[in-house]
């Protein structure tokens, strides 16, 4: 982002961060949902078969521990809030435009919402997913940036 220091530059930097974070979280939530689904399927099979009570107990403790379920719920919340924030940035940059009287106020508000969301959720984005998809997402971001300027 080659903008001179301004609220627009702050908004663009935050939008870029939210854009990439949303892309990573979308993939993270999918893989985490698959892991939980596998646990649940194994759990149901073991409950029906009642073969190995010790394994069933370990899976029960893992699957239903507050940490695993809470993390998944928090990840879902994070995803939905990121979707909302990215739509708000799109609204300002593509629909309302930066010439709108309230554009700076709206950009600051969305930027604060994004920073507060990151602070509240405390979810680290997967660098593995990011680096694997960075080229494709960077091209997509560059195309978006061209439409904004």
Model-derived features: positions:
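Short, Lys/Arg-enriched charge-dense amphipathic segments
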Residues: 18, 48-64, 115-132
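Membrane-proximal, non-transmembrane interface segments of integral membrane proteins
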Residues: 1-28
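Alpha-helical transmembrane segments and their immediate juxtamembrane boundary regions
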Residues: 26-84
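Amphipathic, well-ordered alpha-helical segments in soluble domains
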Residues: 14-17, 40, 85-88
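Residue-identity detector for threonine
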Residues: 21, 60-62, 111, 142
């Amino acid at each position: 982002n080659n903008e001179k220091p301004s609220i627009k530059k702050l908004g663009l930097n935050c939008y870029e961060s939210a854009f990439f974070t949303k892309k990573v979280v979308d993939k993270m939530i999918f893989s985490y949902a698959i892991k939980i689904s596998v646990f649940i399927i194994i759990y149901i099979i073991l409950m029906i078969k009642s073969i190995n009570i010790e394994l069933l107990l370990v899976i029960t403790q893992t699957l239903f521990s507050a940490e695993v379920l809470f993390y998944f719920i928090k990840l879902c919340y994070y995803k939905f809030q990121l979707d909302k924030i990215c739509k708000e940035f799109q609204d300002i940059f593509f629909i309302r435009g930066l010439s709108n009287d309230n554009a700076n106020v709206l950009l600051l508000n969305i930027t604060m919402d994004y920073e507060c969301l990151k602070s509240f959720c405390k979810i680290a984005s997967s660098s593995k997913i990011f680096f694997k998809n960075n080229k494709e997402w960077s091209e997509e971001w560059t195309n978006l940036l061209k439409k904004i300027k």
